[in-house]
């Protein structure tokens, strides 16, 4: 049973139970969580422009994603980093957290997925094979920017 305090849902809980492989969990990788939120935000904007989401759904999902970007709710990502497949458990964990937070922002209860579904709304027009590698690329880009900055500082210190 999903804990009452959890923003994640039953798919995440099943993933936790099925994949106890390493001691490394998604919540230990904030940059990857943020990159996944950015990926979801991009899909929401595109889906709203195509009228595949209502304005209310899109606004709530975007607000939930922004909260994740600000570092909120990171404890809600307990899945193991090593999983079977291509990261489906990670993708569903993110979808469920964003959907349930969006539901709260819309004035609904967690799990009332007829209003905002992890699959049908947050993950619309995506698959794990889209979202996961896109987030990896986004995370690498931001890591690259930090590395370039630090190399610049190192070079300056030698002058």
Feature names for model-found ranges:
Residues 1-159:
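Conserved, well-structured ligand/cofactor-binding cores
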